[in-house]
Amino acid sequence: LQKELNEDLSIINKKSIVLPLGEVKITKRVNSVLIIFRTNTDIEIWDQNKKRLFEEPKIEYSLRALKSLIKSVNFSKTKYPNINFKTIIVDDKSKEENLNKLKKLIDESSLDISITPLNHEKYKDIIKQQRNDQTFSNLASLLQSFELGKEHGEDLVFFVEDDYLHFEPMMEEMVASYERIASQVNKDIFMCPTD
């Protein structure tokens, strides 16, 4: 291999080498990643009777989540420049002031990121009556996200909400893990990155 132990042994889209497992030929290659990022910058924790950890306005969590996601995508793009990353933000009624903060972060990123508003009307006849508007909005946001993933996803679709922070290598590790595991089992897989 002619590599040091602290260097990457794997080559994206070709082979995955994990020391205890050996080499896996990559047959399930990732050429594009669609990220569906769900936001609601005004609603606090709608389904729980507790406060957020740092008790900041929800927009602060959304901005930090998006910023960490952008850093992770940029990190992945430097390692894997041939992978196409696209992000669609599904926004649920954010105030204009908050949307402008998100747009500023997007404009500074130079990544392929767009914002699409949640279409509540489209799901009124599909989702049964809920106890409150927040539950309906959450379900509608999920449905719209799944539809966007089905319509625009090519290889890998990553669904994420606006209150998760990401380590810089998160996206790269997810792509590499998907390629390795899906190639081992010779099937597309569903992955759930954890906290």
Question: What spans do the regions from the language model cover?
Answer:
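Residue-level recognition of the N-termini of beta-strands and the immediately preceding loop/turn
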Residues: 33, 82-87, 113, 155, ...
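Short beta-strand-to-loop acidic/aromatic patch adjacent to the donor-nucleotide binding site
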Residues: 154-165
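Active-site-proximal specificity loops/subdomain of glycosyltransferases
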Residues: 95-154
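Short beta-strand/loop segment that forms part of the nucleotide-sugar
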Residues: 81-94, 117-120
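N-proximal low-complexity "stem/linker" segments adjacent to membrane-targeting elements
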Residues: 1-71
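Conserved donor-nucleotide/metal-binding helix-loop-beta segment in metal-dependent transferases, i.e.
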Residues: 166-194
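Alpha-helix termini
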Residues: 72-82, 108, 148-152, 178-186
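Phosphate/oxyanion-binding active-site loops and adjacent basic polyanion-contact surfaces
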Residues: 55-66, 133-142, 166, 170
